[in-house]
Amino acid sequence: MSLQSENTDPFGTTALGSSDTPALIRMRMVLGYDGAAYNGWARQPNVTGVQQLVEEALETLIRRRIRVIVAGRTDAGVHARNQVVHFDLTEEEYLGLPRNSDLEPGPALLRRINGLLGQQEGAVWVHEVDRAADGFDARFSALARRYSYRIADGIHRWDPLSRQLTMWYREEIDIDLLNAEAQSVLGRHDFLSFCKPKPRATTIRTLQEFEFSRAEDGNIVVHLKADAFCHNMVRSLIGGALRVASGREQPGFLAERLALMVRDSKSILAHPHPLVLEEVYYPDDDELAARAALTRARRDVSQTDSLKSLD
């Protein structure tokens, strides 16, 4: 369901950006969503992404085009428990958020935007929204992102009521075997073998956590944490580990793939529906701007190196 057509602007206005743009107030928003109904986070032609719903709700309230910047894009079918975005408002827009209520601007916006997003039957919901600390950038200030992935291994654990958030795997899995695989790829590496690379983008990442454990219900929960994840990286790592679990590949497969730095028929993606973006980590407020500057600088260097490699 679309709150407003993507290709029309009924307000006759555009996003801020001209030379006479007033001073802006940055807003920080934390939201969750059920990704099953959407074609991923990003806006795309002819399909509905979560970004479109959030921006259209904001545009309805603010009465102009709004662009949100996200901490990490999620693919089609992938969920988020605590996704983080930022967007900018003028002081007039910020102070006008309460309208006739006694609420402060942040809580007022929280109530109003959830009133609109509630039309999506709770598939998208804002947990927090308020004025951001100075220097905050949802994408570049982030220190790390953490994902989880649920697997019901063995048919005795299959539960139809949890199938939309759980991968069903017929055989029981040796998690000690898979944890040994996971340990072999921790650290800073070029994860090209596990990523769908984008032009001028680096595939070097620092994988801080990759662990298989059993929850109280007996199902497996996989936890992955990294400074950032490139496209398809989480699902490719889990897919590779499951090839070892099935016996189709020998132990040491993930480390071997990491060293090869190649994508081929062995680059198998795990299903998207059990994958959840759980949390985005940020430094203390007084370190936000420095972290954003450092991340941008690293990205610029990586892009320059990528271009040199094409010469």
Model regions: which residues?
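Structured-RNA-binding interfaces characteristic of tRNA pseudouridine synthases
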Residues: 2-311
